[in-house]
Regions:
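Internal alpha/beta core interface subdomains
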Residues: 1-19
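Conserved phosphate-binding loops in nucleotide/dinucleotide-binding enzymes
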Residues: 28-36
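Divalent-cation-assisted or electrostatically stabilized phosphate/pyrophosphate-binding catalytic cores
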Residues: 20-21, 25-29
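C-terminal subdomains that position terminal phosphate/3'-OH groups for nucleotidyl transfer/ligation
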Residues: 14, 46-176
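Catalytic core of bacterial c-di-GMP phosphodiesterases, primarily the EAL and HD-GYP domains
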Residues: 40
Length: 176
């Protein structure tokens, strides 16, 4: 892993405006390629690359999470889909996700998945307890995919690793 030369860093930073002028579809497509190539975590660990990603995608309010993932989340991030990956990056208590949907033209189906996670964790109306009764209720109203997204989001955003959440995911995935 070679560090970028200082002169190259200056040139890239100087021309970052050109990257920002690319179409939102192209930027999202390039991000998807980066995610599928399994190198996003490595890029976040390199300070210069992290700085560039933050400059190109200022909507990624939770990108800091990728600098301090536990072993389980590092090993399992790429087994999850791109929509869930986006939810980790953009969800917070603000309307940041709505702006992201507007700017990047995300499909209604994908928006619904991301909004479900946001509603569960950031809405004051709902209980965020992940007890058996609440999980069954989520599964009934939002399906297995919604439930698994909520559990995975909890795993990826928690400071401590909770094996019980993994067991819950496996239980509901195997349940009809």
């Amino acid at each position: 892993k070679n560090d970028h030369q200082l002169e190259i860093k200056k040139i890239i930073k100087k021309n970052i405006v050109g990257i920002k002028k690319l179409s939102s579809e192209r930027l999202l497509d390039e991000l998807k390629k980066t995610f599928k190539s399994n190198c996003f975590i490595k890029l976040c660990e390199i300070d210069f690359s992290y700085e560039i990603i933050c400059a190109v995608f200022p909507e990624f309010k939770q990108i800091e999470l990728f600098r301090k993932l536990n072993d389980y989340t590092k090993n399992n991030l790429y087994s999850l889909d791109f929509t869930f990956f986006l939810s980790i990056l953009i969800l917070d208590k603000t309307d940041n996700s709505d702006y992201f949907f507007y700017k990047f033209n995300i499909s209604k189906k994908k928006q619904k998945r991301i909004k479900l996670i946001k509603e569960f964790f950031f809405s004051k109306k709902q209980s965020t307890k992940l007890n058996a009764q609440n999980l069954r209720k989520i599964s009934y109203f939002n399906g297995k995919e919604g439930l698994v997204d909520i559990l995975n989001y909890k795993i990826f955003t928690s400071k401590k690793f909770d094996k019980n959440l993994i067991n819950q995911i496996n239980y509901f995935k195997n349940k009809e």
